[in-house]
Amino acid sequence: MPLTHLNEENQPKMVDIGDKETTERIALASGRISMNKEAYDAIVNHCVKKGPVLQTAIIAGIMGAKKTSELIPMCHSIMLNGVDIDILEEKETHSFKLYARVKTQAKTGVEMEALMSVSIGLLTIYDMVKAIDKSMTISGVMLEHKSGGKSGDYNAKK
C-alpha cells in the first residue's frame, strides 16, 4: 500500500480530502499513568499544591484535541463536535486510566485528536505531581475504537 503522505517524488504532502464525503467520525483512545502511593494519594485527596489535578488534566486533554493539527504536521484542521474525557482511579496499582472520546462531522477522522487528548491529559498529571514522584510512567496510549469514514469501524483487540 503506498503512503498517502508522500508525493511522486517521495516528498511529504498533506493528503487532499476535498472529494471525501462528510460523515460522523468518532474515536476513543486511552492511556495510563502509574505512580507511587504518595503521589496517588495526594491526587485523590486533593492535596497537590498546583491545584485540582484530574480536573486540570481533563481541561488539558480537551485543549490537546483542539490543538492537534498545530502539532502533528500532516493532520488536517477540523471542527470538533465534542471531546469527552473520563479518568478512572486504579487504587490497587496507584494508577489513573484516561479515556478520551472525540466526535466530529468531517471528511477525515479524529483518531489523532483522541490520541493527543489522552497524551496531553496524562502529561498534565505528570507535570502537576512530578515534585512528589519523578518516576511516574505513562503507558498504553492507544486507539480503542473508531467509527466513520471509508475504512469503517475499528475496535482494538482486548
From Swiss-Prot:
Active site: D127
One Gene Ontology term from the biological process aspect of the record: Mo-molybdopterin cofactor biosynthetic process
EC class (word): lyase
One Pfam family from the record: MoaC
Pathway assigned to this chain's UniProt record: Cofactor biosynthesis; molybdopterin biosynthesis
UniProt: substrate binding residues: M74, C75, H76, M112, E113
CDD domains in alphabetical order: MoaC_PE (cd01420)
Protein origin, superkingdom: Bacteria
Alphabetical keyword list: Lyase, Molybdenum cofactor biosynthesis
SUPFAM superfamilies given in the database record: Molybdenum cofactor biosynthesis protein C, MoaC
Its EC number(s): 4.6.1.17
Substrates-to-products reaction catalysed: (8S)-3',8-cyclo-7,8-dihydroguanosine 5'-triphosphate = cyclic pyranopterin phosphate + diphosphate
Annotated GO MF terms: cyclic pyranopterin monophosphate synthase activity; GTP 3',8'-cyclase activity
NCBIfam families: moaC, PRK09364.1
Purpose: Catalyzes the conversion of (8S)-3',8-cyclo-7,8-dihydroguanosine 5'-triphosphate to cyclic pyranopterin monophosphate (cPMP).
Assembly behavior: Homohexamer; trimer of dimers.
Family of the protein in this entry: Belongs to the MoaC family.
Name of the featured protein: Cyclic pyranopterin monophosphate synthase
